[in-house]
Amino acid sequence: EKKDNEDYHFTTDMTDEAIKWVEFQHAMTPDKPFMLYFATGAVHAPHHAPKEWIEKYKGQFDDGWDALREKTLARQKEMGIVPENTVLAPKPDDIPNWDDLTDNEKKLFALQMEAFAGFAEHTDNEVGRLVEAIAEMGELDNTLFIYIMGDNVSSAECGLI
């Protein structure tokens, strides 16, 4: 029945089930530790998220990946994450300059970046719901979180298309 709902999203469903499981474990054996391995599909292809999460990023990548790389480095310098004299790393040869793409390619790749960003933020929000549930149980200070998110650069879907 859930999957027939047009608003269904697997990450949200996983989070709901994880919260139920943690709450059940805590209710049944409050003095025992629990272990939960919570591995979402994000941000592996296909990149999908609820529409409102993708729409938040509408137009934010229209300047392309070259401009985004420069803005990201500038922001990292401003925040003190990297030294002021840090230079932009070379871009891989198989990634073309944004300005060399056709208008249709730019539109497609900007949309893909919007979907990726929306998917990543939606997943982060769902992890936050799980953390909140553990906090409401009074177990947050007694819980170790190991939060790993990788770009999975070696997966088959790498490349532009």
Descriptions of predicted regions:
Residues E1-I161:
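Active-site-proximal cap/lid insertion segments
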